Amino acid sequence: MYRKPSRQMTLDDFSLPFSGSLSTDNRWVRLARIIPWDQIEKEYAFLFPSDRGNVATPVRMALGSLIIQAKCSYSDRETVQQITENPYLQYFIGLREYQVQKPFTPVAMVKFRKRFNSKRMAQVNELILKAEADQQPVAALIDEEKHPTNNHDDDDTNKPSGTSTAGTELTQQEEPAKPNQGTLILDATCTPADVRFPTDVGLLNEAREKLDEMIDILHQGLGKQEKRPRTYREIARKRYLTLSKQRSPKGKQIRKAVKQQLQYAKRNLRIVEQLLDKSSKQTQPSGLNQRYMKLLSTIRTLISQQTAMYQTRSHRIQDRIVNLHQPHVRPIVRGKAGAAVEFGAKVAISLENGYSRIEKLSWDPFNEAATLVDTIERYRQRHGYYPEAIMADRIYRNRDNLAYCKKHGIRMSGPRLGRPIANMAIKKAEKRLEQQDARERNAVEGKFGEGKRKYSLSRIMARLKETAECVIAMQFFVMNLEHKLRVLFVQILSMLFRRQNTAVLAEI
């Protein structure tokens, strides 16, 4: 059940002890002003259609706590602790007065991330970008009212007498398509998950240890009616350490160790299945909990994949598991000097006027060039026209994308196809244009750098698939909020300078 607050609180509604007051210049107060809480609440209330049960957490508290965590890179416990100690953070999440009690437990942060998944965060992000787009025509209209021009007449004397409503509708229907406007910058990156660098021997050893834990639990649940099955855990551990302590083991040694750990893991898996069968036949079954059953399913898949790769002497397989606790994580080949392979989600984004949108988020590798057409079509749906130019990497310049851009009159950055131009003047002009495009495309590289250095895009700490996607989407959402604050500051500053110049000219 969701209960909507009577109205969204303002700064004057928040009460402090000892007759204090909050500063209007605080960063959290300014940030709370630019977020459309009422519009987000309308979408959030649909998650709770029932009118029974406990009252859900308000949207400002749920989303606000996630924004605080993403902006400051806090853990769940630290986020709750900071909110408890800071009155500005309590105002930001919608509390009416300062309180010393914790507004919620750290476990609630996981529920908040599940509610605001990547699709819902994309909708919230669009509300912010739409509000910014709506402010630009208003600002232009205000400037036009302050500085009117004489290029148009307000009287109707010059209008033809034969006009009608039907004629107006016909004129609107026959209006030609709008010319291409704007610049769209595209790029993709990998957001690494918080996983250890995987090796075949290490994964099999970890699977063997987890199966040993399951055997202990199942054997204890059976009441120790029989002797515990032999698993050779000490010998298996010793053989694993023999290889892992070597600096550069040879290929034959690695293959031998994989075979040994694979045999130990298969033996433990057979024992677990036998104990599960015995446990199900009891009057009071005492099997594994949901977490262990999910882990057991992942281990089965891992053993199957490792067996197939060992038999075929290959190191590649589809949907390869690289972590037992995060089976959705896949290896992403980047081919860069720092990290040839990263393990996490791949994100393709578009940058428009400094604001970023997630065009595609996938845990499986994909070619970002395939997202160009859909990205341009979504741009056209938002604005009613195609972009004038596309700034993208060379991987986007395949034949299909170039033909699509040529068909719709869109210029794509990069060198032209075909033979080099003999005319030196044209060649120099194209070279200058390529350099200018490269400078403009640096904005998206800076956006990735901002997310990975200032925020937590360089390591996603969330372990569940849906919560990790929420964390990734939240990082770009917070960066858009920060950019909006910077744009708002520049607009206010330019307005002050304009008024000052107007006053000086009036005195002259």
Model segments located where?
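Charged, often Cys/His-bearing segments associated with DNA-binding zinc-finger transcription factors
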Residues: 1-35, 42, 139, 151-164, ...
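Basic, short loop/linker segments at the boundary and entry of helix-turn-helix/winged-helix-like folds
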Residues: 22-67, 72
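Short, conserved catalytic/metal-binding motifs centered on acidic residues
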Residues: 26, 65, 79-83, 105-112, ...
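Acidic, metal-coordinating catalytic cores used for nucleic-acid/nucleotide bond scission
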Residues: 52-57, 87, 391-399, 418-420
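Active-site- or DNA-interface-adjacent structural scaffold in DNA-acting proteins
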Residues: 96-326
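Basic, amphipathic alpha-helical segments enriched in Lys/Arg and hydrophobic/aromatic residues
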Residues: 292-298, 303-310, 432-508
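Flexible, glycine/threonine-enriched loop-and-boundary segments that flank and lead into catalytic domains
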Residues: 323-338
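Electropositive, glycine- and tryptophan-enriched low-complexity nucleic-acid-binding patches
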Residues: 336-383
